[in-house]
Structures are given as C-alpha cells and as structure tokens.
Amino acid sequence: LGKALPRARVCGFDISKLAVKAAAGKHKGIPFAVASSFAIPLGTGSVHLLTDVFSPLAQAEFARVVKPGGFFLYAVPGERHLYGLKEILYEAPYENPHRETAYEGFRFVRREQVRDEISLPDGEAAMDLFAMTPYYWKTGVEGVKRLQEAGAFQTEIAFDFLVYERL
C-alpha cells in the first residue's frame, strides 16, 4: 500500500509478535504493533482504509476506527480455497461458506475474486502450507499422516476480496 499510495500513512498490526517482528524488519519506516482486531490501537474515525486478511471480523471495532466515507477491505477464503489439501486431510472434504456481505455501519461495494492453483512438490511443502491454516489445529492424526506421506499435488487457491464503504 505504501508504494501504491506514497503520501499515505501506513501502519500495521497483528496479534502475533513473530508476524509483527517479521513485518517491521521487512518494511522499515512503517510502524507495526502487536494488537488484536478487537482492540485496534488507533483513534475513532482515523482510518481511511482498513484491511483485514484472513482474520476474525471485529465489526464494531472496524466501524469505530474507519472514518465515514472510508473503506474496509476484507480478504476471506473462497468456497474452494485449498480444496485439494482438504481432500487429503479429510474423508469428507468441505467447501468454505460463502461470506455474507451485509455488515452494520458499512455499505457493500463489491466482491473481487482471485482463483488459481498452486503446486506442492512433496509432503514437506504440504506440511509448511498446512501449518499456516486453521486446519492445523483441528485435523486428526490420520489426516496429518496422509499429508506427510503425500507426493506432489495441486490445490486450488480462492480468495474473495470484499470492499465496504463506511456509512
């Protein structure tokens, strides 16, 4: 965002200390903080554009910090995001739910979808991807074993970018 909007003041936060440390090291000059989406360390109505990438929706807090006429960009997994991975992990793989687009205090503007496939060359690469997903915390031992033993495979990636304007 800083490169696309050079006059913008950009900051970032994440609940993970490791993620904040990595981001601060990579993006010198941009302030980062360890914080929850449910307690954003910014003033009321101070944000022109808020982005939320694969994090829980903190609707009331987002409405508090985004100024009227400002925007909220919500990146969520599409219905078939990582479906090939789920076919290995689960006996009955499932699609992700289609996200609702109505949030109090915001007007839905549009949905942009990105769809593609990625190749995972072996079980090690698959395990690296798996560790970054919520499936890591809720998959049984048998599913993990199948993934560790997986050869090369492809999986879909599906991202929905939902754009909202603050009322």
Predicted regions and their residues:
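Class I SAM-dependent methyltransferase SAM/SAH-binding core
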Residues: 1-40
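Short, charged, surface-exposed secondary-structure boundary motifs
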Residues: 21-22, 43-45, 82-88
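Hydrophobic beta-strand segment of the Class I
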Residues: 48-51
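Short glycine-/small-residue-rich Rossmann-like dinucleotide-binding loops
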Residues: 54-55, 77
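Conserved Class I S-adenosyl-L-methionine
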Residues: 114-167
